Amino acid sequence: MYKLVLVRHGESEWNKENLFTGWTDVKLSDKGIDEAVEAGLLLKQEGYSFDIAFSSLLSRANDTLNIILRELGQSYISVKKTWRLNERHYGALQGLNKSETAAKYGEDKVLIWRRSYDVPPMSLDESDDRHPIKDPRYKHIPKRELPSTECLKDTVARVIPYWTDEIAKEVLEGKKVIVAAHGNSLRALVKYFDNLSEEDVLKLNIPTGIPLVYELDKDLNPIKHYYLGDESKIKKAMESVASQGKLK
């Protein structure tokens, strides 16, 4: 049996302000830093250690991972960073307030943009400073691969091949792996692992800063999965994620 630990980054400054973030590189809030520390302490308490880590190219995931590894006394392990684990790109919604957007377009429309499987938001023009072709961290990635907007289906299309080609290989070698990423890149993995329907993934809420453990068989099929920590706190955190994008 193998174990894989997934962690969504701690609360970011834009999570706190209820803004669409996507590929915008924002920092952790004070609460997010505390969540990352708590995740690290919880993993340490439960006896977890890691051989290799994976993360996105965005600071909030990197910083969460670094804090967790520091709490575990494992800042020395290898970390592989990839744009393929980035958050879903929210296109022209990036930087907009979710509640204000719901008031303008309607909650149902915003829910579709946020959580539907195959409907992307309005795209960014390549001249827009928010477009990833303007960001030097993506300068080595072919321009045609960089999104101007994404639906979850698009995110799955870049995350799952990376799982298969890179992360799964390390798990099968017996390495203890942690992945620190984002709400939608992790939803892509959970959908794949649990064979969720498009309707079921719409209802999936992954809370910030709480370790999600998958136990996998020899073929990397899931045996079971569970969050670490207090159940009532986990439930409250999931409800908080679900409430985003609603009128206040």
UniProtKB/Swiss-Prot annotation:
Q: In which pathway does it act?
A: Carbohydrate degradation; glycolysis; pyruvate from D-glyceraldehyde 3-phosphate: step 3/5
Q: Which Pfam families does the entry link to?
A: His_Phos_1 (PF00300)
GO process terms (BP):
gluconeogenesis; glycolytic process
Give the EC number(s) listed in the UniProt record: 5.4.2.11
The UniProt GO MF terms for this protein read:
phosphoglycerate mutase activity
Q: Which residues bind substrate?
A: 8-15, 21-22, 60, 87-90, 98, 114-115, 183-184
Q: What class of enzyme is it?
A: isomerase
Q: Site Transition state stabilizer: which residues? A: H182
Superkingdom classification of source: Bacteria
What's this chain's function?
A: Catalyzes the interconversion of 2-phosphoglycerate and 3-phosphoglycerate.
* NCBIfam families named in the record: pgm_1, PRK14115.1
Q: What name appears for this protein in its UniProt entry?
A: 2,3-bisphosphoglycerate-dependent phosphoglycerate mutase
- The species this protein belongs to is Borreliella burgdorferi (strain ATCC 35210 / DSM 4680 / CIP 102532 / B31) (Borrelia burgdorferi)
